[in-house]
């Protein structure tokens, strides 16, 4: 369940940030794309290191560390506005990439090690299901929250980005990332409960 929540919160970013960079901040598509590459680059660098550390020190510390970083990222995104320096976005996105790298490898290890050898295929398919379910939930939930927040701020129903009204978008974006923060907190709590159950 924690993985579903984290993948959902990740897709909040994938849905909202392109609007922020290209429409609100008026950055070119190529520049916005380069900025968004920070996340996968940190994943590429961090995931192998996370897997190595999982084998050395166990999954617990890394999982909690990754979730804490993801909570911090959602909070940082909440404070983005029209005047935020680009380096602030880059740092927040780098933390998100590192947090995901720290969380996913040990979380996968815990899932795969919790089943018998003959059930590894089922466990692997459940991991894939959690990822895809999180993506679907993230896309549906983030767009709903974004446009609801924008509609409330604008006083009329909004179903797309409003040209020349980035202030309205910022309101919806902040509400969206607040919910993303709550999802990360819920994932953190569920992980604590899972660890308590397995250590008894």
Model-based region annotation:
Residues 151-162:
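Peri-membrane helix termini and adjoining interfacial loops of integral membrane proteins
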Residues 161-164, 194-200:
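Intrinsic disorder in cytosolic terminal tails and internal cytosolic loops
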Residues 163-174:
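Membrane-interface segments at the starts/ends of alpha-helical transmembrane spans
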């Amino acid at each position: 369940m924690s993985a579903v929540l984290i993948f959902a919160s990740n897709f909040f970013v994938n849905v909202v940030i392109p609007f922020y960079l290209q429409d609100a901040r008026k950055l070119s598509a190529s520049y916005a794309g380069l900025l968004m590459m920070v996340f996968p680059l940190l994943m590429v660098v961090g995931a192998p290191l996370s897997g190595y550390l999982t084998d050395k020190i166990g999954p617990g510390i890394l999982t909690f560390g990754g979730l804490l970083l993801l909570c911090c990222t959602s909070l940082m995104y909440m404070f983005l506005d029209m005047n935020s320096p680009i380096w602030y976005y880059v740092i927040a996105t780098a933390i998100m990439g590192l947090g995901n790298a720290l969380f996913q490898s040990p979380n996968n290890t815990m899932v795969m090690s919790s089943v018998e050898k003959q059930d590894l295929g089922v466990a692997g398919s459940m991991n894939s299901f959690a990822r895809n379910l999180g993506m679907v939930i993230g896309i549906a939930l983030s767009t709903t929250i974004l446009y609801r927040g924008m509609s409330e701020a604008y006083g009329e129903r909004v179903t797309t980005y409003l040209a020349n009204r980035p202030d309205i978008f910022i309101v919806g974006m902040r509400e969206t990332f607040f919910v993303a923060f709550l999802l990360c907190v819920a994932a953190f709590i569920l992980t604590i409960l899972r660890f308590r159950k397995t250590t008894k």
